[in-house]
From Swiss-Prot:
Site residues by UniProt (Interaction with tRNA): H155, Q387
GO CC list: cytoplasm
Primary residence: cytoplasm
Protein name: tRNA-specific 2-thiouridylase MnmA
Protein localization: Cytoplasm
NCBIfam families referenced in this protein's UniProt entry, alphabetically: PRK00143.1 (NF001138), trmU (TIGR00420)
Keywords, sorted A to Z: ATP-binding, Cytoplasm, Disulfide bond, Nucleotide-binding, RNA-binding, Transferase, tRNA processing, tRNA-binding
Family: Belongs to the MnmA/TRMU family.
Residues annotated for ATP binding in this entry: G42, L43, S44, G45, G46, V47, D48, S49, L68, G154
């Protein structure tokens, strides 16, 4: 679906307002980008993607907005997001295109998410969604239908383009690839963790204008430009949870109740549950059992349909296995390498020794033929299978994969 003005509209960005210092720097860099200044912007209807489009327009780029239709119904990924994105495009005087991605989203995200929960994991769908549903499809569609070879999004991350590969200190035999993925400068908003699955081919064509802004500056810039989404609140939940009301409601829609046992780590029966999909490693609240001390989930057994709980002291581990690894900014290490590992979004990176191991057949078939063992320098609480483990050296995102287990 495409909504294109018959006659080119004039942007309603106020001309008299002066950009913030951060905004001025972004505009200067956007104006200085080499090559064709025509670009597609992924618009969700939120303030971040709205400002991304607005700054590009203000910097003189030829901008076209693209919104993915992921689900039917209300919510930021559904009708509400489409309406707000269309309104922003009207305000900026740019065309708005809607891609019906519901079938892809159902296949690549919903079905795999349900399967993961049934297997006792806690999947992290956002990284996979970025890879399979957002960046690649938008780039392909924009090039085929609009002749555009670049895309911008409102993610808080940065990309550094190098003329030639260079060495880095973490693994002297490894070369950094030409297009490095870096953390966003706003440490509280950095979203590089969710982008570890992007390829070099994608990074070459992507621009993240907000990567050097703080969230507060984004709000100020959006207010300066008088964007209609300037005060729109951020979504606090996974889009599926927001769409269904809660994650439990989403899972109940796709997975039938299946009663099982809740056991103490010594084998003592403590209670019953109605589905392993409602539990995650480290969980303490909502277990439905009473005990003399707080208990945490330490294991979810899909084969026996059992949930194992124990005191917090038993919920920490000093190692894990990671599979389906995508090496973003360096070539795959062939030897042991010291890396900083982020085990969940906004968690503090911890040091670990990464040892490459033999890949699984499924990883090879999915073009992710890399696995590793991580040995942490100290025990980590609630290492959760299904979540992403992302490797850094300082601000450089080296790569990442999916936690398989201990």
């Amino acid at each position: 679906m495409t909504i294109t003005p018959k006659n080119k509209r004039t942007s309603s960005i106020p001309k008299s307002q002066t950009a913030t210092i951060g905004g001025e720097e972004v505009l200067k860099k956007l104006k200085g980008v080499e090559g064709d200044h025509s670009i597609a912007v992924g618009l969700s209807g939120g303030v971040d993607s709205s400002l991304t489009a607005a700054l590009l327009v203000e910097a003189g780029w030829n901008v076209e907005g693209i919104t993915l239709w992921l689900m039917s119904g209300k919510g930021s990924c559904c009708t509400d997001g489409l309406v707000d994105a269309a309104g922003i495009c009207e305000q900026l005087g740019i065309p708005h295109h809607v891609i019906d991605a519901r079938e892809t989203f159902q296949r690549e995200i919903i079905e795999s998410l349900v399967k993961g929960y049934q297997e006792g994991m806690t999947p992290s769908p956002c990284s996979k969604c970025n890879r399979f549903v957002k960046f690649s499809p938008i780039l392909e569609w924009a090039e085929q239908n609009l002749g555009l070879k670049r895309i911008a999004t409102g993610h808080y991350a940065r990309i550094k383009h190098l003329q030639e590969p260079i060495k880095i200190s973490s693994a002297k035999e490894n070369q950094i690839r030409r297009h490095q993925l870096l953390r966003g400068l706003d440490q509280n908003k950095d979203q590089s963790y969710f982008l570890y699955d992007l390829s070099q081919e994608i990074l070459e064509k992507v621009i993240f204008p907000l990567g050097e802004l703080k969230k507060a500056d984004t709000r100020k810039e959006a207010s300066r430009i008088e964007l209609r989404t300037a005060e729109k609140p951020e979504s606090q939940d996974l889009c599926l949870a927001e769409h269904h009301g809660s994650m439990k409601a989403f899972l109940d829609e796709y997975i039938s109740p299946r009663n099982g046992e809740i056991l103490l780590s010594n084998g003592q029966l403590l209670g019953q549950h109605d589905g392993i999909e409602h539990f995650t490693i480290g969980q303490r609240k909502g277990l439905g059992i009473a005990w003399k001390e707080p208990l945490h989930v330490i294991e979810i057994q899909s084969s026996t349909n059992r949930v194992i709980v124990a005191p917090r002291s038993e919920a920490s581990r000093d190692n894990c296995t990671v599979g389906s690894i995508n090496w973003v900014s360096i070539e795959p290490p062939s030897k042991k390498t010291i890396v900083e590992v982020q085990l969940r979004y906004r968690s503090k990176p911890v040091l670990a020794t990464l040892t490459p191991i033999k890949p699984l057949k499924k990883d090879i078939e999915n073009d992710r033929p890399y696995r590793c063992n991580l040995q942490f320098q100290s025990e980590q609480f609630s290492i959760t299978p299904g979540q992403a483990a992302v490797f850094y050296e300082g601000e450089i995102l080296l790569g990442g994969g999916i936690i398989e287990g201990n």
